[in-house]
């Protein structure tokens, strides 16, 4: 049936939009969307009993007869239309980051750097919503790396309403594959790393990579061209119209450029978006060819990148990073450890520079950027680190970094497990990596969910072969064992959970925080600051 959403909003006094029957509120419009695992149409009767204003569905098989139920051709299209009416605003400058590892770090570095440049900025991702330059405005954020499109636009609208102009956010392969970013377009898109993960969902590494690449083909701004503006405006007598073709629809949009974005943003809008890639990705040549075939501009960062990292001097407390930019040797110091963080920091710097900020100023500011919670996070004044490394590549990088900076006669210890109901093929590989790089391996549980944790541990142990290991199911006891066996100058890495403050066992989500456990145990020993 024909419908006019604006009129429906007014007629039914709509207060909000919802796609989740568990969180729908009185006077919301509920959009009954069929998802990967759950069908919103199964909950129509339930939400009608919760005094929703309307239900919109495209399932013609529904037999529900109710004045509040409206049938449309495409419920997803109706939702997008409603979002544009209800949550039309978003920060003007958007940066998206994808990659197997490094997403959370890069979006945080971007938002922190903007803030240090005097701008109000925010980041969205695995850790949640971080806001810099004003009070935290966001509550009740769903726990997904990439939010559903409605949640994302609600948050983006809230940020824009509070004058936040700069937003960096994570784009996961699941989110990209499921089109959770809707029609969002970004100024720069970053690719931090690529290695095995999520094969339980994507099945093959090729599918996983192609899902990542959707960020660049679907969501990067396409190049635009100038069109003379006829007539004066209150903003500028030299203003002109920006004309941009939307590749997905073939339509064009016109924006009064200087009035809306300011002169600083002119050139990148005319040029289109930029892809910033880690040159150390094994599949980098495939990625570059793919982007060339789609006429997407890119720049690479890394040991063999356009921005070339030439030397890194690191310790347990800091590192000095040397690189070449525009044929000029540059360097900066950072308290963020791990050589892989060098490319993450420079990717963040380039994404901001592309929008128009001075590169030298950005590099000066990078020295003030702080580590991200649960990302090679050093606990107090100890040699104990908590890291989110839950993939083979991330675990290998974390252990390699610590092995390279430890004293010759000291030992490197690791506590880790693997998540249940996730990619099983990586478990033995992670066991193999731990046994090869660490002197002491402690296998424990990490969000077993609905799998038998003993079987998960056995799969990890199958990769260890003849190396020594200790198996302790209880994660707190495993951490305690690791701490108690540390000798002078030894290092302990607690891997897999990072920032997480829970342990998922079956359907229960129990409080658990690796860093807090360490602080508690070390405080009892009197050897760390709480």
Swiss-Prot record:
PTM section of the record: Carboxylation is probably crucial for Mg(2+) binding and, consequently, for the gamma-phosphate positioning of ATP.
GO BP of this protein: cell division; cell wall organization; peptidoglycan biosynthetic process; regulation of cell shape
Gene3D superfamilies given in the database record: Mur ligase, C-terminal domain, Mur-like, catalytic domain, MurE/MurF, N-terminal domain
GO cellular component: cytoplasm
The keyword Cell cycle appears for this protein: yes
EC annotation from Swiss-Prot or TrEMBL: 6.3.2.13
Binding site for ATP: 99-105
Sequence positions that bind meso-2,6-diaminopimelate: 422, 446-449, 496, 500
Chain location of the short sequence motif Meso-diaminopimelate recognition motif per the record: 446-449
Amino acids binding UDP-N-acetyl-alpha-D-muramoyl-L-alanyl-D-glutamate: 21, 145-146, 172, 178, 180
Cell compartment(s), UniProt: Cytoplasm
Keywords associated with the record: ATP-binding, Cell cycle, Cell division, Cell shape, Cell wall biogenesis/degradation, Cytoplasm, Ligase, Magnesium, Nucleotide-binding, Peptidoglycan synthesis
Broadest EC class assigned to this enzyme: ligase
MF-aspect GO terms: ATP binding; magnesium ion binding; UDP-N-acetylmuramoylalanyl-D-glutamate-2,6-diaminopimelate ligase activity
Residues of the RPE1 insert domain: 221-269
Cofactor(s) the protein needs: Mg(2+)
InterPro entries: Mur-like_cat_sf, Mur_ligase_C, Mur_ligase_C_dom_sf, Mur_ligase_cen, Mur_ligase_N, MurE/MurF_N, RPE1, UDP-N-AcMur-Glu-dNH2Pim_ligase
SUPFAM superfamilies, alphabetized: MurD-like peptide ligases, catalytic domain, MurD-like peptide ligases, peptide-binding domain, MurE/MurF N-terminal domain
Modified residue annotations for N6-carboxylysine: 212
A family per Pfam: Mur_ligase_C
Function text: Catalyzes the addition of meso-diaminopimelic acid to the nucleotide precursor UDP-N-acetylmuramoyl-L-alanyl-D-glutamate (UMAG) in the biosynthesis of bacterial cell-wall peptidoglycan.
Family recorded in the similarity comment: Belongs to the MurCDEF family. MurE subfamily.
Name of the protein this chain belongs to: UDP-N-acetylmuramoyl-L-alanyl-D-glutamate--2,6-diaminopimelate ligase
Organism in which the protein naturally occurs: Rickettsia felis (strain ATCC VR-1525 / URRWXCal2)
């Amino acid at each position: 049936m024909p419908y006019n959403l604006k009129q429906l909003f007014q007629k039914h006094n709509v207060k909000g939009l919802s796609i989740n029957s568990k969180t729908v509120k009185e006077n919301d419009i509920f959009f009954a969307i069929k998802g990967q695992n759950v069908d919103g149409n199964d909950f129509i009767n339930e939400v009608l009993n919760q005094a929703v204003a309307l239900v919109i569905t495209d399932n013609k098989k529904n037999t529900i007869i109710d004045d509040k139920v409206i049938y449309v051709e495409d419920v997803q299209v109706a939702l997008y239309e409603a979002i544009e009416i209800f949550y039309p605003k978003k920060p003007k400058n958007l940066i998206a980051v994808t990659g197997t590892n490094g997403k959370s770090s890069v979006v945080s570095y971007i938002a922190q750097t903007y803030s240090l440049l005097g701008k109000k900025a925010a980041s969205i991702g695995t850790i949640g919503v971080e806001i810099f330059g004003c009070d935290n405005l966001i509550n009740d954020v769903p726990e997904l790396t990439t939010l559903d499109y409605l949640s994302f636009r609600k948050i983006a609208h809230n940020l824009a309403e509070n004058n936040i102009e700069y937003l960096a956010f994570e784009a996961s392969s699941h989110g990209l594959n499921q089109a959770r970013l809707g029609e969002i377009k970004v100024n720069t898109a970053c690719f931090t790393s690529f290695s095995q993960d999520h094969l339980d969902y994507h099945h093959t590494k090729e599918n996983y990579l192609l899902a990542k690449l959707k960020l660049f083909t679907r969501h990067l701004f396409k190049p635009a061209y100038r069109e003379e503006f006829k007539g004066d405006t209150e903003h500028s007598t030299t203003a002109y119209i920006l004309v941009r073709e939307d590749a997905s629809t073939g339509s064009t949009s016109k924006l009064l450029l200087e009035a809306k974005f300011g002169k600083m943003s002119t050139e990148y809008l005319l040029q289109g978006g930029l892809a910033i890639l880690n040159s150390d990705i094994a599949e980098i040549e495939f990625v570059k060819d793919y982007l060339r075939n789609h006429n997407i501009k890119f720049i690479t960062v890394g040991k063999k990148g356009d921005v070339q990292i030439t030397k890194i001097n690191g310790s347990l407390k800091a590192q000095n990073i040397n690189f070449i930019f525009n044929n000029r040797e540059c360097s900066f110091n950072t308290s963020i450890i791990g050589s892989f963080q060098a490319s993450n920091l420079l990717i963040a710097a380039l994404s901001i520079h592309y929008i128009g900020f001075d590169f030298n100023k950005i590099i000066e500011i990078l020295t003030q950027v702080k580590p991200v919670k649960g990302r090679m996070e050093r606990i107090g004044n100890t040699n104990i680190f908590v890291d989110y490394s839950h993939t083979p590549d991330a675990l290998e990088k974390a252990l390699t970094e610590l092995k390279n900076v430890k004293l010759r006669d000291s030992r490197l210890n690791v506590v880790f497990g693997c998540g249940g109901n996730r990619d099983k093929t990586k478990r033995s590989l992670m066991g193999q990596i731990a046994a090869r790089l660490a002197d002491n391996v402690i296998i424990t549980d990490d969000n077993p969910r609905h799998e038998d944790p003993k079987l998960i541990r056995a799969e990890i142990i199958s990769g260890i072969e003849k190396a020594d290991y200790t198996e302790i199911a209880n994660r707190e006891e495993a951490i305690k064992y690791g701490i108690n066996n540390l000798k002078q100058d030894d290092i302990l890495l607690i891997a897999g959970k990072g920032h997480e403050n829970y342990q998922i066992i079956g359907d229960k989500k129990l409080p658990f925080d690796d860093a807090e456990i360490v602080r508690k145990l070390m405080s009892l020993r009197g050897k760390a600051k709480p």
